[in-house]
């Protein structure tokens, strides 16, 4: 049984930890608001960009003039996975959730006999995936020194992906990230980048009755648009990730603060009981000694 001094020290230690978790919760809450606004602002642009891409892609079709980033290599033997996670922890299961989602996809591809290459954006995903797939990781993007995610960060990743494609390093590229839904809900998401996929907006483009004319021509526009779209989609993924990370961190620190409060109450109760028992014992000894006299 711990002594009164040990219990007192533990109570003080838990109280100090509670102050830290409470402060981290408040910081995460402040950052969450800004991150959520940035993520929500990026969605319409990225969705509209994909819609425009789908419309122009329909005009070009399978024409020989269509850029390789849209048509692909015609194979799907080698897959490049760009996995976006956080640089830091203390955000519950946020990082493990997206890493697990990507890991399951890697296992599925390997079981099909495909070659897999991975680019890790964020330290935590890198730490998790390298335990099993260290030989598959070809690059790691370090954003620890980046205070605010900017388009230039996504653009560098996009250029790296396109450079690898032009060198014939892969056939299909898929982006993995956590889509922010709410403070307690972040959904692991996979989005194909190459060959350029219009995704759910393709149906919208199919049903559109408008007819567009393109200058100089649709293929030339696609050649410029697809690389930008890749960077835009990566940028949106990074912003969604930041919002999800802050939401998960705020929730985790809130739980930690409440758990610390419960632990303090239990330790204080235990401390008071032991102190009461000790005082009672001393009183009994005093009374017994007085009666003996």
UniProtKB/Swiss-Prot annotation:
SUPFAM superfamilies assigned to the protein according to its UniProt record, in alphabetical order: ATP synthase (F1-ATPase), gamma subunit (SSF52943)
Gene Ontology CC terms, in alphabetical order: plasma membrane; proton-transporting ATP synthase complex
Family: Belongs to the ATPase gamma chain family.
InterPro entries: ATP_synth_F1_ATPase_gsu, ATP_synth_F1_gsu, ATP_synth_F1_gsu_CS
A Pfam family assignment: ATP-synt
Gene Ontology biological process: proton motive force-driven plasma membrane ATP synthesis
Alphabetized UniProt keyword annotations: ATP synthesis, Cell inner membrane, Cell membrane, CF(1), Hydrogen ion transport, Ion transport, Membrane, Transport
Quaternary context: F-type ATPases have 2 components, CF(1) - the catalytic core - and CF(0) - the membrane proton channel. CF(1) has five subunits: alpha(3), beta(3), gamma(1), delta(1), epsilon(1). CF(0) has three main subunits: a, b and c.
Keyword Membrane: yes
Single annotated GO MF: ATP binding
Gene3D superfamilies in UniProt: 3.40.1380.10, ATP synthase, gamma subunit, helix hairpin domain
Known function: Produces ATP from ADP in the presence of a proton gradient across the membrane. The gamma chain is believed to be important in regulating ATPase activity and the flow of protons through the CF(0) complex.
Protein name: ATP synthase gamma chain
NCBIfam families: ATPsyn_F1gamma, PRK05621.1-4
Subcellular location, record wording: Cell inner membrane
Membrane topology, record value: Peripheral membrane protein
């Amino acid at each position: 049984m711990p002594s009164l001094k040990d219990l007192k020290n533990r109570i003080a230690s838990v109280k100090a930890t509670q102050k830290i978790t409470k402060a981290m919760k408040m910081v995460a809450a402040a950052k969450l608001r800004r991150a959520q606004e940035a993520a929500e602002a990026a969605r319409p642009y990225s969705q509209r960009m994909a819609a425009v891409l789908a419309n122009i892609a329909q005009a070009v079709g399978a024409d020989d003039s269509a850029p390789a980033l849209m048509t692909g290599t015609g194979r799907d033997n080698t897959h490049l996975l760009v996995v976006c996670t956080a640089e830091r922890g203390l955000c519950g299961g946020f990082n493990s959730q997206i890493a697990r989602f990507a890991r399951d996809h890697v296992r599925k591809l390997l079981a099909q006999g495909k070659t897999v290459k991975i680019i890790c954006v964020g330290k935590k995903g890198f730490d998790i995936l390298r335990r099993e797939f260290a030989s598959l990781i070809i690059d790691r993007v370090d954003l620890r020194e980046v205070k605010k995610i900017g388009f230039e960060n996504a653009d560098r990743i996009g250029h790296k992906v396109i450079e690898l494609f032009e060198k014939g390093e892969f056939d299909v590229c898929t982006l993995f990230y956590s889509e922010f839904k709410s403070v307690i809900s972040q959904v692991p998401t996979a989005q194909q980048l190459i060959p350029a996929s219009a995704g759910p907006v393709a149906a919208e483009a199919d049903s559109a009755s408008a007819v567009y004319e393109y200058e100089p021509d649709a293929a030339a526009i696609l050649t410029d648009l697809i690389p930008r779209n890749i960077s835009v989609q990566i940028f949106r993924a990074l912003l969604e990730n930041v919002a999800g990370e802050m939401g998960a961190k705020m929730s985790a620190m809130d739980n930690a603060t409440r758990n610390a409060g419960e632990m303090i109450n239990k330790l204080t109760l235990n401390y008071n009981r032991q102190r009461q028992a000790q005082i009672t014992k001393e009183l009994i000894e005093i009374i017994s000694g007085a009666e003996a006299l």
